[in-house]
Amino acid sequence: MRVVILGSGVVGVASAYYLARAGHEVTVIDREAGPALDTSFANAGQISPGYAAPWAAPGVPLKAVKWMFEKHAPLAIRLDGTRFQLQWMWQMLRNCTTERYALNKGRMVRLAEYSRDCLQALRAETDIQYEGRTGGTLQVFRTQQQLDGAAKDIAVLREANVPFELLSSDELKKAEPALAAVSHKLTGGLRLPGDETGDCQLFTTRLAALAEQLGVKFRFNTRIDALAVAGGKIAGVQCGGEMVRADAYVVALGAFSTNLVANLVKIPVYPLKGYSITAPIVDAAKAPVSTVLDETYKIAITRFDERIRVGGMAEIVGFDKRLRQARRDTLEMCVNDLFPGGGDTANASFWTGLRPMTPDGTPIVGRTPVPNLFLNTGHGTLGWTMSCGSGQLLADLMSGKKPAIRADDLSVHRYLSETDGEHRPAYA
C-alpha cells in the first residue's frame, strides 16, 4: 500500500519506519529542511512511561489561579481570541477530576510502556545511537504536600506494574549524587528506574536514515496546503502546484494537524507552548546523571553526553513562538538551584516549541471517519516517549493486524458523536 505521511517529527518518522518495515511504500512530506526541526528539535530529552500523565489533574484549576501571580509559574494563559481555545480549556477543566485523571493516566501509561518496549527492540535490532541513558528518572518534591500527593500516581503505577522507588530527601543522592548538596531543600522523590533519556532530534535523524534504508522517501522543503477529497475519501495532498497521491494518508503534524483536517474531522489538538535551554557541562560531578523532574516548576533537567537540557512549562497562547526572557530566567533558576555549578547556563541555547495537546492528555492514534485518513498526533509533552509505540500501533492498524495493546480508546472516535450527520467533538 502506498502511504503518505505528513510530518517528519519523531512521531511522523517513527510511523514511516514501522510502516515501511511492514512492507508499505512510504513517502514523508514536511515543510522543514530535515527531520525533527520543529516540535521534536529540543524537547526535554526524557522517555518517561511511568510519568506519563495528563496536565488535566485534580487540583490544577486552583493551582492555575495561584500561578497567575507567581514569577516562575509553570503555566501561563493568554487568550488568543479563538472559540477553539476557550472550548479546549473548558474540556481540559472537565478532565480535572479524580476519575478522569485515573482513566487518562492509565491509557497514557499503557501506550508509553508499550512504546518503551518498542524502542528497546529497535535499539537491540539496529543499535541506533542518540546519547541515550537508561538511568531512570527522578521526580523531586520541595514540599510535604507534593510528596503526599504522589500517592495517586503511585496507585496507577502499581496497577500498571511499573517499578518505582519512593525516596526520602537523604536517599535522593543514591540516584543523583549531585543532589546531596541541596537535599535540605527537598522533601523526597519518586524514582522510576525503568525510564530512559536521550537526544530526540538526534534519534529522529538517525531513525529517518534507517527508514530510508527501508525505502522511505522524504520530501523536505515542501509546503502542505490541503487534503483533497473525492468520493468520501482523501484523493491527494495539495503541495503547492502539485497533487501527491497515495492509497492512505497519515497526519502527524503535531499542533498543525487540527487545521489541516478541520473540514473532515474535528480534533481537539491545541498548541501548548514549552521552552528549553541546552547548556554545556562545566563540572560533571555537579551535573545530573539522568533526568530530574522538579515538581514545583514542572521542569525536566536531563543529562546528555556533554550537555544539560532543561525544559518544561506550558503556555496556552496559540501559535505564538516568541522567546520570552522570563521563561529562560525560570529554566536557569531551576537548574542552578538543583545543580549549582553543573552547567554553563549563561552560554546555553534557548528554544521554544509547540506541543500538540489534547484536553485529556491522551494522543489520537488510528483511524478516522474518512476511510483512508489516519491520525498520529496529540502526544503533548510525551511525543518521544510514545513515538515508537504509536508508530508500531498505527502500522499494525493500517496493515490489518491486531495491535499488541488495546487501541480503541486511543483513536479520534473517543471524541466524536454523530449529530445530524456531522462529526462533532464530544470530548468524552
Curated annotation (Swiss-Prot):
Cofactor(s) recorded in Swiss-Prot or TrEMBL: FAD
Entry-linked SUPFAM superfamilies: FAD-linked reductases, C-terminal domain (SSF54373), FAD/NAD(P)-binding domain (SSF51905)
Keywords (A to Z) from UniProt: FAD, Flavoprotein, Oxidoreductase
An example Gene Ontology molecular-function term: D-amino-acid dehydrogenase activity
The keyword Flavoprotein is assigned to this record: yes
Catalyzed reaction equations: a D-alpha-amino acid + A + H2O = a 2-oxocarboxylate + AH2 + NH4(+)
Binding site for FAD: 3-17
Pfam families per the UniProt record, alphabetical: DAO
UniProt EC number: 1.4.99.-
GO CC aspect terms: cytoplasm; plasma membrane
Pathway: Amino-acid degradation; D-alanine degradation; NH(3) and pyruvate from D-alanine: step 1/1
A GO biological-process term: D-alanine catabolic process
HAMAP family: DadA (MF_01202)
Protein family (similarity comment): Belongs to the DadA oxidoreductase family.
Role description: Oxidative deamination of D-amino acids.
Protein name: D-amino acid dehydrogenase
